[in-house]
From Swiss-Prot:
InterPro entries per UniProt: aa-tRNA-synt_IIb, aa-tRNA-synth_II, aa-tRNA-synth_II/BPL/LPL, Anticodon-bd, Anticodon-bd_dom_sf, Beta-grasp_dom_sf, TGS, TGS-like
Residues holding Zn(2+): 333, 384, 510
GO biological process: threonyl-tRNA aminoacylation
A GO MF term: metal ion binding
TGS domain span: 1-61
Reactions performed catalytically: tRNA(Thr) + L-threonine + ATP = L-threonyl-tRNA(Thr) + AMP + diphosphate + H(+)
Sorted UniProt keywords: Aminoacyl-tRNA synthetase, ATP-binding, Cytoplasm, Ligase, Metal-binding, Nucleotide-binding, Protein biosynthesis, RNA-binding, tRNA-binding, Zinc
PANTHER family the record matches: THREONINE--TRNA LIGASE, CHLOROPLASTIC_MITOCHONDRIAL 2, THREONINE-TRNA LIGASE
Name recorded for this polypeptide: Threonine--tRNA ligase
E.C. no: 6.1.1.3
Major location category of this protein: cytoplasm
Stretches the record annotates as Catalytic: 242-533
Cofactor annotation comment: Binds 1 zinc ion per subunit.
Length: 638
């Protein structure tokens, strides 16, 4: 007689084994109708699997985070059900849940088209309307192999080969279609309503380009129609803001096949990059960082000693010279330790903060590359703080202030913070892990910050804090991080002399605010829709002549503005002024200055903001004053 304990502490006794659905039914018909699955002793379980012993049970509906993930996973199986009915000689690979949706990788000689997406979506809708039950079959490995051999599902058989002999495998039966999954899934298709198939893309089995080429169908699903519509609106807005499109439109950068994952910065984009670098350099200087520069190519012996050769070798670019193998650095930390190691260090010298705008290369798979967001060559705003155990909390606390200051400058007010603690496999004593985790926790709590704990998610060499931005489309971008490292200073012989005149290894804090310049600029392009605030814009002001008579004044003002340290350009084409204003607006120039006969007569410009607001008549001294104010507050002119 299982005794079921519910979240409110109440208990229900059943005479025999009982399912989640039956428990829900005993509470109320409405709850039973809404039940998708359950959590039994903190483990997710299908709604129709019997519970035989005393358990703590949480009933899951579409209102729960787990519920919507189960709905999305079930929709992935519906893709399989639909394509198997429509197309012949299809083999299903994997169909996981991803953020805001799901996908299924499919092997087929037939190439799917956007028209096929519509056809598949229509078939899914037909299947949903039949309200069929999704059956779960728990079978042995042998039975699972037999099932998928009969169906000639090559990829499923490969997955089964990797599963241990003992235990049962969950098969989910959607009428005539059978798929394999850990589950859980919805008990009936009536729970599957609000979805949309989004796009097609290519992929490889297991993400390896040497394996079979697959076709990926992406989709999204939500609990409510409004949530689906809101998401599709966000997707549409995201496409408008796509940094790759805007980068091309505004001549910021490009990427070409001869150098995949590496950026060709155009003058406009490089200006943004340089302004960003200058700003970060000022922040670093103000906070007592020492800027350094380290080599691009380093003998593999250093990477072997640091441990990167063993873990990262496949992701490194290498080159050979005079019988020596060099790695193009994928990260900066081992090189920073080499600088720390030059000369004897005392505890009185600590903390030492070494910063570098370090250019790194990583051999990312070509299929994973994505504009500025995922590249092979990137520059980190990287720094390493060498300190004592006792200094960790203060250094982390100061860094948190720095992160919030920088993010606020760019208009990011919603910051998500996650603290990752010790994993099972780790180096260092329990004592230093305790001290480090306590230091990071106190640094966060002393600032009354909301943060999320990620137990066991720290690196093997120390705990870390991650900082993620939420943008105008509610997308989350992980950018900043501060990571405690006990291991690398030991591996690379970094030492200082303590108060007792004994040599000790410092703690090293890896930290970055932006993450990488390339990715952060990509985020900014999409956040601002390329309407950069005046301090960051490639050109801060454009001067427009109304007639040919005003060209000379335009050119003279342009020279004076540029000579005073601002970024200015002119449009002196023989075009109507309305057309020029429209072109300047489409070009996203923050300030538009018009010079006609009236303005020239009083040695001034008629100024307007990018949003069309008339700012008035300005002579050059007043224009400079306004621009200085706008640049100083790092704001937009709108």
């Amino acid at each position: 007689m299982p005794i079921i304990t519910l979240p409110d502490g109440s208990k229900k006794v059943f005479e025999k084994s009982v399912t989640i659905l039956e428990i829900a039914q005993s509470i109320g018909a409405g709850l039973a109708k809404a039940t998708i699955a359950g959590k039994v002793n903190d483990v997710l379980l299908d709604a129709t699997i019997p519970i035989n012993k005393d358990s703590k049970v949480v009933i899951i509906t579409s209102k729960d985070k787990e519920g919507i993930e189960i709905i999305r996973h079930s929709f992935a199986h519906l893709i399989g059900h639909a394509v198997k009915q429509i197309y012949s000689d299809i083999k299903m690979a994997i169909g996981p849940v991803i953020e805001d949706g799901f996908y299924y990788d499919i092997f087929s000689e037939y190439r799917f088209t956007p028209e096929d997406l519509i056809k598949i979506e229509n078939r899914i809708n037909q299947l949903i309307k039949t309200n069929y039950d999704v059956e779960i079959l728990q079978v042995s490995k042998e039975e699972a192999i037999k099932t998928f051999k009969e169906r000639d599902e090559t990829f499923k058989l490969r997955i089964i080969e990797e599963i241990p002999e003992e235990g049962l495998i969950n098969l989910y039966k959607h009428e005539e279609y059978i798929d394999m999954c850990r589950g859980p899934h919805v008990p009936n298709t009536r729970h599957l309503r609000h979805f949309k198939l989004l796009k097609l893309s290519g992929s490889y089995w297991r993400g390896n380009s040497e394996n079979e080429s697959l076709q990926r169908i992406y989709g999204t699903a939500w609990a409510k129609e409004k949530e689906l519509k809101d998401y599709l609106t966000r997707i549409e807005e995201a496409e408008k803001r796509d940094h790759r499109k805007l980068g091309k439109k505004h001549s910021l950068f490009h990427i070409q096949e001869e150098s995949p994952g590496m950026i060709f910065w155009h003058p406009n984009g490089w200006t943004i990059y340089q302004v960003l670098e200058k700003y970060i350099r000022e922040i670093l200087k103000k906070n007592d960082y020492l800027e350094i520069k380290t080599p691009q190519a380093v003998d593999k012996s250093l990477w072997e000693k640091s441990g990167h050769w063993e873990k990262f070798r496949d992701d490194m670019f290498t080159t050979a010279s005079e019988n020596r193998t060099y790695a193009i650095k994928p990260m900066n930390c081992p090189c920073h330790i080499q600088i720390f190691n030059q000369g004897l260090k005392s505890y009185k010298d600590l903390p030492i903060r070494l910063a570098e705008f370090g250019s790194c290369h990583r051999n990312e798979p070509s299929g994973a590359l994505h504009g500025l967001m995922r590249v092979r060559n990137f520059t980190q705003d990287d720094a390493h703080i060498f300190c004592t155990e006792e200094q960790i909390q203060e250094e982390v606390s100061t860094f948190i202030d720095l992160v919030f200051e920088v993010y606020k400058t760019f208009g990011f007010d919603e910051i998500i913070i996650k603290l990752s603690t010790r994993p099972e496999k780790r180096v260092g004593s329990e004592d230093i892990w305790d001290k480090s985790e306590e230091a990071l926790t106190k640094a966060l709590d002393n600032k009354n910050l909301k943060w999320e704990l990620q137990p066991g998610e720290g690196a093997f060499y120390g705990p870390k804090i991650e900082f993620s931005l939420k943008d105008c489309l509610n997308r989350v971008w992980q950018c900043g991080t501060i990571q405690v490292d006990f291991s690398m200073p030991i591996r690379l012989d970094a030492t200082y002399v303590d108060i007792d005149n004994e040599k000790r290894n410092p703690v090293m804090l890896h930290r970055a605010i932006l993450g990488s310049f390339e990715r952060f600029i990509g985020i900014l392009i999409e956040q601002y829709e390329a309407k950069f605030p005046i301090w960051l814009a490639p050109y801060q002001i454009i001067l427009l002549s109304i007639t040919d008579r005003n060209i000379e004044k335009c050119l003279k003002f342009n020279e004076l503005i540029n000579n005073n340290g601002y970024r200015s350009k002119v449009d002196i084409r023989n075009e109507k002024i309305g057309y020029k204003i429209r072109e300047a607006t489409l070009g996203r120039v923050p300030l538009i200055a018009v010079i006609g006969d009236k303005e020239e007569e009083i040695d001034s410009v008629a100024l307007r903001a990018l949003n069309g607001k008339n700012l008035g008549i300005f002579n050059l001294p007043n224009l400079f004053k306004l621009m200085d104010e706008l640049i100083e507050k790092k704001g937009r002119t709108e």
